[in-house]
Amino acid sequence: MPDTLLEVTMQRRDFLKSASLAVLMPQVPSLMAQMRSALPLKITDIRIVRLKVVRETGAIVAAWNPGTVITERIGGGSIVEIHTDQGLSGIGPGMDAAWLEAAKAQLVGKNPFDLERLAGPLRYYIGGSPHSISALEIALWDLIGKAAGQPVYKLWGADKDRVPAYASMIQLSTPEERVRMAVQLKSEGWKAIKLRAHYPTLKEDVQMVEAVRKAVGDGMDIMVDANQAQSFGSWQPGVMWDFRRALETARELQALNCLWLEEPRLRYQFDELARLSSLVDIPIAGGENNRGVHEYRWILEQKVYGIVQPDIMVADGVTGFREIGALAQAHHKRLIPHHGGGNLGTITHLHAIASWPNSPWIEILHDPPAAPYTNGFAIFENPPRVDPQGYLNLPQGPGLGVEIRKDLIVA
């Protein structure tokens, strides 16, 4: 029995939080059990499939990694395939080949509909590669959707059939070029642009945002990313912000009617970030490099961010990613995922966002001409496109609803 009013209050809060999570998480396990009995499948093999490079499209320097030149290309990389005894297969982003045999040991001979039962062993035996866990679970959900004959987002509980996309810049560039880009994107139907705040001084960052706001008016939303949470520790390349710069920047961006300020401090400066969130009205966003439901529980309970941004390739696989989504709903917080890598991770984000009423945007890395989002989507036979109204429509085919171009597969 609780002895104090505080204990009663805490027990009531924990009960309500648990009850909220139970209501918010779609009843996938029971649905999976029903489909498992109706659709017996057995995993027979897992393969890593390499993709041909079609062509290079240019070189860029990412704002968060100054001095490092990235060659952008169409094609290349790899995907993972999970095959079954019924001829169905699922696809996911490429996984680390070093973990392939461990993955086979846990999945071959199993029914993909037992995903909740398989999630624990995957984390135990492949825990050193969260990217690989995510790749495998994405492929499993693609397989489950194909077996059920439904798009993944409908299995997760569809809230919407299209999602507004925002164009996320990669380079710092110049104010003049970012103005040109913003005006062009607005004319193409994009509803929002995310700029990078990486100039040596606060004044230069603000002047860039001011120039873009003046050019596009109030008819286009602007987000700003400081990318201050890229490393585990207290060092990263480029300019380092202190709390004062974060606070002053947030106030300036608030006056410019920006939607949010992203990652203005180090990844684990939770106390400072919570304090910053309490001092400004503009939402502080972040979390793309945080991993695990436990970290997000702390972030949400301590009101670290106004908007949480998990990435399915980092957070904790599809299983953990969706649990984080339910947790954000229980705390009445918006969840707007990080970009997901640009191809199959991004497509999986699209399905998840379509199942969450508290998720109003999808991030699309799009910095043409060298790095348009179409580069990542070019590996698909039926690539989604941002429509003239600025939306990505949900694929309606079963599973993820996309297939890999056969001409790109390395034999």
PLM region spans:
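Metal-dependent enolase-superfamily TIM-barrel catalytic cores that perform enediolate-based chemistry
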Residues: 162-280
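Structured beta-strand/loop patches that form or line metal/cofactor-binding pockets in enzymes
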Residues: 36-86, 373-379
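Shared catalytic-loop signature of beta/alpha-barrel
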Residues: 110, 114-117, 268-285, 290-391, ...
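N-terminal secretory signal peptides
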Residues: 1-11
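Metal- or metallocofactor-binding catalytic centers and their adjacent structured scaffolds
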Residues: 40, 45-49, 83-148
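Conserved, mostly hydrophobic/aromatic
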Residues: 87, 136, 149, 261, ...
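N-terminal export signals
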Residues: 2, 14-33
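Glycine-rich, aromatic-flanked loop segments that form ligand/cofactor-binding clefts
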Residues: 137-172
